[in-house]
């Protein structure tokens, strides 16, 4: 699911350097894939990540902390065992909108990889 906020191409000039992309992920015990996911999407043009970790018992929290030293990641520790996905994802989307303002927000799962034909999420989104 992609949530869009309007991009004013008159203001941005329509260039991909002006497009901001944030990705949200709700994760739990994703140590086997989370680093690959974040590195891949960062290389594809995602500027900011907001990642909510819900009670991971594996190395996911340590991986996120290590990656946040080199990639813009806002880590949210969700310790509530009442799984409230709708509320949590909405909260992450709101935080992403505050971070990037007039840009794009992609809600993603740790095992999903967005592979645009153009080779760049920014090029793909600029063409829309």
Model-derived segments and spans:
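Short beta-strand/loop segment that forms part of the nucleotide-sugar
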Residues: 47-55, 76-79
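Conserved donor-nucleotide/metal-binding helix-loop-beta segment in metal-dependent transferases, i.e.
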Residues: 117-128
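The conserved acidic donor/metal-binding loop of glycosyltransferases
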Residues: 109-114
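Active-site-proximal specificity loops/subdomain of glycosyltransferases
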Residues: 61-107
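A generic secondary-structure signal
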Residues: 40, 94-96, 127
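N-proximal low-complexity "stem/linker" segments adjacent to membrane-targeting elements
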Residues: 1-39
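Short, acidic, metal-binding catalytic loop of nucleotide-sugar glycosyltransferases
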Residues: 39-48
């Amino acid at each position: 699911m992609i949530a869009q906020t309007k991009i004013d191409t008159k203001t941005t000039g329509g260039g991909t350097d002006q497009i901001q992309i944030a990705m949200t992920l709700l994760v739990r015990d994703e140590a086997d894939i989370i680093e690959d996911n974040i590195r891949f999407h960062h290389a594809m043009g995602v500027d900011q990540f907001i990642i909510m970790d819900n009670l991971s018992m594996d190395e996911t929290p340590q991986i996120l902390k290590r990656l946040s030293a080199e990639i813009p990641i806002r880590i949210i520790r969700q310790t509530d065992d009442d799984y409230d996905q709708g509320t949590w994802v909405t909260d992450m989307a709101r935080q992403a909108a505050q971070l990037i303002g007039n840009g794009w927000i992609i809600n993603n799962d740790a095992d999903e990889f967005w592979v645009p034909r153009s080779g760049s999420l920014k090029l793909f989104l600029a063409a829309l």
